[in-house]
Amino acid sequence: MKIKILTVIILISCHFGFSQNIYSIDSLITESIKLKVFPGAQIYIKKNDFVYNKSYGFHTYDSIIKIENDHLYDLASITKTIAGSLAIMKLVEDYDFDINSPIKKYFKDFKRSELGESKIIDLLSHTAGWQPYINHPKFLIKKNGNLKKRFISDEKKSNNMSLSKKLYVKNSFYDQIKKRIKKTTLNKVGKYKYSGLFFCLIPELVKNITGTDFENYLNNSFYKFLNYKLTFNPYKNHTLKKIVPTEIDQFFRQELVHGNVHDETSALMGGISANSGLFSSAESLANLLFLLTLENSILINSNILKNFTQNQIKNDTLNQRGLGFDKVRFVSNGSKIYPHRNLSKDSFGHTGFTGTMYWIDPENDLIFVLLTNSVYPSREKNKLGNLKVREKLLELIL
């Protein structure tokens, strides 16, 4: 059954709390574009009955393609929650999946690895002691800067998949990714340390349990209700004029990353991962979040969602996490410091490296989405973080 999402219209009325700040929000985004924090952006705000959905700027600083509300952004690590966490929530609902199980129960090749004892619940809350990331591209680059032809090709073949517009990676490279993960060591188990490694394994976990590949499982369980407007590898079904580019990759792919996922590890997995890989517009992402948080949601049991979005780290107020989801953080005296002091403790969300963020606060009836490509043309300068653009937006909203 498909749910028809109501067309978003801008309802501006002085009756609503933050509508008077719309001009200030527009000014902040416009000024950020002038300062080259990002060339363009989409913003979606729903608070009570007030909805504001607007696009700003252009795909790049050459000002050729204007951002429209249906254009797609690389969501980066937001994928961890609206693909990875959602998939596992659905496993809990449909397959009685036990998140307290060690991963060796589902990955036989981890039985001899010390990582095999790590529990799913700890991996989702980033307290399993896994290292943050592995720089897989460095294993593919020769000393002279050329890519190793054993795994990378500039020709499409039956045994490879798209890495970028010009490059292809062998289908079997995932085995190399998993092998390197298995060789890592644990450090400070029980302490918070953000890690994306387990999220690279979730597609295989889903396939092992359901017999369905990760992308189809998500489409059938969630994205079909949004008319498949959240998607992996958008270049397959969308013109590039509707996909916002991310970065001019001068380290690995040596080209503008456009239509393929920006995250290198996810790209080496063919663009389909729970670590990164989803593309969406702000409106489509907000509609998914709205459906998720309905009391009688057709997407997931509300009790499961509540469990996954509750704080799992009880002894560290500076690092509050749900199961995949980010939470409001506190200092020792109880004051909220991230992402905003007026958000409730039950609120949750996530950010993405490409310059994306969403936050949901049921108590304040708030859904906030900001999508940008702040890594364009390069990731070197983090102006989005340094200028606290997201925090300033929340200040105006709340």
Question: What function would you assign to each model-found segment?
Answer:
Residues H350-L398:
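Structured C-terminal helix/loop/strand segments within mature extracytoplasmic catalytic/sensor domains
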Residues Q42-Y44, N53, D122-S125, Y358-W359, ...:
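Structural recognition of the beta-strand scaffold that forms the well-ordered cores
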Residues M1-S24:
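Bacterial Sec-dependent N-terminal signal peptides
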Residues G116-K345:
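Short, surface-exposed loop or secondary-structure junction motifs
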Residues E31-Q42, S63-L123, T184-F198, S273-S276, ...:
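Short active-site loop at a secondary-structure junction
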Residues T30-S32, L72, Q312, N342-F348, ...:
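Short, P/G- and charge-enriched loop/turn segments at secondary-structure junctions
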Residues I22-L75, D96, K179, D263, ...:
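Short, conserved catalytic-motif segment at the N-terminal edge
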Residues I29, I43, N48, K80, ...:
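Residue-level preference for non-acidic, small/hydrophobic
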